[in-house]
Amino acid sequence: MTRDTATPATIEHRIGPTGRLSVKVADWDLVLASSPDDVARVRGADGQALPDDLEVERGTDSLSIRQPSRFPGVGFVLGAQAGGRRLAIEVPAHAAINVESASGDIAANGLRGDQHLRTASGDLRLDAAAGDVTTETVSGDISVGVEGSVGLAVKTVSGDVSVEGGRVERVRLATTSGDVRLTSELGPGPHAIMTVSGDAILLSNRGLRITAVTVAGDLKSDLPHTSEGGPGRRSLVVGDGATELQFRSVSGDLRVMDPAAAGNGRIPTALRPVASQQSPLNEPDDAEATRLVILRALESGEIDIVEATDRLATLDGARDA
């Protein structure tokens, strides 16, 4: 492996059709596209010069580019803005990529290998995506346009998520307060959507079985369906129920809609909040105090969404007993 400290106008390295590319910068936008050959290329977009502090490592089938002075660790630098600076990146379509920008936007088009994309305050947009895709952002929105089939893992705090087109073989989607719109065909799974207060819209005319664990949220379908269960734990079956999806939320709703709604503009961007059947103001003081402890632990990261919903469901069950 060789390491460069001087930054040329364009960084090029042959990594092969299934090689590896890693790019970590602080506040540049990243624009990725498939290359016509097996060479990875990185340059400043629109004639911009590359950052002068890049550290470049070339391996037999890999290229790594990093801003060590601006990107000291895995944590993100919040509050900075990209200011219109962009890196244009070409990479073989089936290469494995790992790209991170602390505050810049990331866009990718036509990539089909293992993809890991991460930003803190920027947006993520993938077009004509296939392969295994992992995306993560804190406050930015995530948009995934699928071409062919994809395995998808999505994590965001306050950003909204949109997935459309193609076929999603499996999905694990977690958000705190962002809303979710999933209109792609679903494969065999497993499929899971987890939110705290975010709502989810799912388009499907195929058989679905949705199992929901929620505290104050609701589960709805515009299609003919059957449902069972009560507050806290419910299931909803559309058609033959062949495809299973797990939904966990504290107060978010999930709604199944007919794909015909996609063609006439009737898909809402968010669901109208549904009032809980029992207001927390009417709960005993000790139950409300316990509820606040659970929610604060979730907010601080001490527990995850799954554990929080289980604890809250247990709390409500004890209250109703």
Over which residues does each language-model region extend?
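Intrinsically disordered, low-complexity terminal regions
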Residues: M1-A321
